């Protein structure tokens, strides 16, 4: 397995490697540090002044620290890469050069607004065709939540994650959320028999989605500790569940916008990514 570890030297970015190391074995890790000097005044000439060397030294220090941490986690150091310019462009360009299996990112986000998905993380996820592991804080890496909705994307996420990560001895949950039919327009909720029928079909669909994912997870030798069907707003129910159960990692699927070669994160995925403090693995395959 080959991993691209994107780091700016911050504690949050290092948390991504720390947390991911609990799920990956014998992986080759390429640390990447992108020095974004776009914030400097246009009057500053990086080539003719001492700034360039200073920032190169910063990048080298960040990469040397990452190298040390890779060794501490028992992983294999690949290439140390430094780049200058837009962080997003630097990451995406490197992803095109090498066939990676996983991208690691720490997300600073907007903590004051309780939104954890930073602009760099968001753009990388939207443009990535490989799984992206987003980390916000150091976790215990014990409780894993698979979110399923019956779509090919959520099932494929479960399949790919179990092949990519070592989930042995982890506490595994599977959750599916059915929306409350009583929240439909008033004229549609007047017929109780119709509402009961809709609720029954939703439960059948959710049960099928959970059983499909569970069958695969157990097939690869893992144990599902709990499977839950909830009713309500899917994003909020997942967020609440993650907080209540102190989940360490959420596994979610995303689908490709084939016309633009980008991933389409639905409103549920987007809200979960922005509001949980657990790690999130977004799988696009």
Q: Which positions does each model-derived feature cover?
A:
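Small/aliphatic-rich secondary-structure junction motif
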Residues: 1-49, 143-196, 215-222
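Active-site-adjacent beta-strand anchor residues
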Residues: 6, 81, 106, 147, ...
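Short, conserved glycine- and acidic-residue-centered signature motifs
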Residues: 13, 59, 117-121, 154, ...
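Residue-level recognition of beta-strand->loop/alpha-helix junctions
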Residues: 33, 81-82, 176, 228-229, ...
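A short acidic, glycine-rich active-site loop
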Residues: 49-61, 193-208
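Structural beta-alpha unit
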Residues: 49-54, 68-103, 215-250
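Gly/Ser-rich helix-loop-strand patches that form or flank binding pockets
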Residues: 92-140, 240-285
